[in-house]
Amino acid sequence: DQNAETRNKYSEVTPMLDLAQDLSQRLINMRRRRGEIDFDIDEAKVLVNEEGIPTDVQLRKRGEGERLIESFMLAANETIAEHFDRLEVPFIYRVHEQPKSERLRQFFDFVTNFGLMIKGTGEDIHPSTLQKIQQEVEGQPEQMVISTMMLRSMQQARYDDVNLGHFGLSAEYYTHFTSPIR
């Protein structure tokens, strides 16, 4: 938070939080460079009254603190997975395999309706190709539908005792030992 009053109130920890923010941004940039697909889509938040009856649906925005924690969690999950892989001991990985080529071809056909042209057939694709599509439609009216259809073209992540990497994160090693933020 760049609010002067807030920074002054927490002046003892502000330098540490500034360093954490800088490190988090470096980790985000590193993941982007290697091709991570970022599905940072606003989520729906259902508001309920005292009786538990829904009264409204609002967009839930992710804050900087949540992004910072997520960045460190991803780094921790990757580091632990790589460590155990190198130890060659039994371990459970969170794997996300490359999308099936037929699903990707369908997605590529779909996005051509929005004027996007993708080179290739969907065989042996790198995550950065999909990342570039995300970047092209960022802020456009069709961003939500294209991101949703891209997500649906992917395989589901799962747990496995064999390290198969994580396609969406463009990570060679990944596990899931941290708890969800939400």
Question: Which stretches of residues belong to each language-model region?
Answer:
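Electropositive polyanion-binding surfaces
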Residues: D1-R182
